[in-house]
Amino acid sequence: MEKGTVKWFNNAKGFGFICPEGGGEDIFAHYSTIQMDGYRTLKAGQSVQFDVHQGPKGNHASVIVPVEVEAAVA
């Protein structure tokens, strides 16, 4: 799986884009591919892991898994 950061996500339209960690073109993200319980959404700046496949208009993310960021212990 690749890693990246959510660039933006529109809840009303159900899609957004992910910036891949290694650079390159932004990757299309659809709510139906987000792997989580309840309301499936992403937030700008959120870290995610995902698989990439070629769609008709560019790269699409599939199996999007939000990455939990552990809080630093002082």
Curated annotation (Swiss-Prot):
The keyword DNA-binding applies. Keywords: Cytoplasm, DNA replication inhibitor, DNA-binding, RNA-binding, Toxin. GO terms for biological process: negative regulation of DNA replication; regulation of DNA-templated transcription; regulation of gene expression; response to starvation. Its main location: cytoplasm. One of its GO terms (molecular function) is single-stranded DNA binding. Residues 4-64 form the CSD domain. It is found in: Cytoplasm. It comes from the Bacteria. InterPro entries: Cold_shock_CspA (IPR012156), Cold_shock_domain (IPR050181), CSD (IPR011129), CSD_CS (IPR019844), CSP_DNA-bd (IPR002059), CspD (IPR012751), NA-bd_OB-fold (IPR012340). It holds the Pfam family CSD. GO terms for cellular component: cytosol. Induction: Not induced by cold-shock. Stationary-phase and starvation inducible, as well as by oxidative stress (30 mM H(2)O(2)). Repressed by MqsA and MqsRA toxin-antitoxin system. Disruption phenotype: Deletion represses the production of persister cells. Binds single-stranded DNA and RNA, but not double-stranded DNA, through hydrophobic interactions without sequence specificity, resulting in a packed structure. Homodimer. Inhibits DNA replication at both initiation and elongation steps, most probably by binding to the opened, single-stranded regions at replication forks. Plays a regulatory role in chromosomal replication in nutrient-depleted cells. This is Cold shock-like protein CspD. It comes from Escherichia coli (strain K12).
